[in-house]
């Protein structure tokens, strides 16, 4: 289990419709909440008021939401909607009916709108595993460090950057690598279909150029 300090326990049940009732969202997204989610509990609040930790410059609180699912998966659109509606950094604990669970977190930055809004940059999740196998690093000097440790722990190998690099730079580097991977896949598919030898050679040179950036 996550073994979060008892002082952080909040334990408030949140009605599913709270996340979309006043928003202009499609009936399909509403159906995701109805059909894929059984129960949402705001389980913990990680903050200087609930833990022995200093304030951060960019992170004031981390909210933990325990979501019990009706089936095996939760569509990412539901998580994104919840993440965007809550003006704090969020850690999701998703639990399947069989008791297996995973953690999900999005690296998010304050939007330049002045209304406490956030912009989601990149989302990460652990593999599905037994609940007692889920652990979080809670040793940090301040809330910024705690948040960074959680994101890095959840992301694991999906974050292609050394720990010495800032989290912001690490996320941007990972996004750039994923963009290059998509471009390479498209170019390789085009080269397989291309009949013209000169165009094949041109595509091959572009593939080599992008591979050099990986």
Walk through the language-model features, giving the residues of each.
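N-terminal, leucine/charged-rich tether regions that mediate assembly and partner docking
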Residues: 1-102
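Extended assembly-interface/linker segments at domain junctions
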Residues: 76-165
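Short, charge/polar-rich alpha-helical segments
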Residues: 161-175
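Non-transmembrane amphipathic alpha-helical segments
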Residues: 173, 177-194, 210
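Short, charged, amphipathic alpha-helical segments
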Residues: 197-208
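Charged, long alpha-helical assembly modules
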Residues: 208-214
């Amino acid at each position: 289990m996550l073994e979060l300090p008892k002082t952080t326990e909040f334990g408030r049940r949140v009605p599913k419709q709270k996340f979309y009732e006043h928003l202009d969202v499609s009936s399909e997204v509403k159906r995701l909440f109805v059909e894929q989610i059984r129960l949402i509990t705001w389980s913990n609040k990680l903050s200087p008021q609930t833990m022995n930790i200093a304030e951060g410059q960019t992170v004031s609180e981390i909210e933990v939401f325990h979501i019990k699912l009706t089936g095996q998966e939760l569509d990412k659109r539901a998580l994104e909607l919840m993440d965007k509606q809550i003006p704090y950094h969020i850690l999701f604990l998703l639990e399947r009916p069989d008791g297996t669970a995973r953690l999900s977190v999005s690296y998010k930055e304050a939007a330049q709108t002045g209304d406490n809004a956030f912009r989601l940059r990149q989302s990460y999740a652990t593999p599905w595993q037994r609940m007692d196998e889920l652990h979080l690093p809670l040793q940090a000097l301040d809330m910024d460090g705690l948040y960074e440790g959680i994101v890095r722990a959840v992301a694991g190998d999906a974050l292609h950057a050394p720990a010495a690099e800032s989290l912001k730079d690490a996320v941007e580097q990972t996004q750039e690598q994923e963009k290059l991977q998509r471009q390479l896949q498209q170019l390789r598919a085009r080269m397989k279909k291309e009949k013209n030898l000169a165009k094949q050679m041109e595509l091959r040179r572009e593939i080599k150029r992008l591979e050099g950036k990986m």
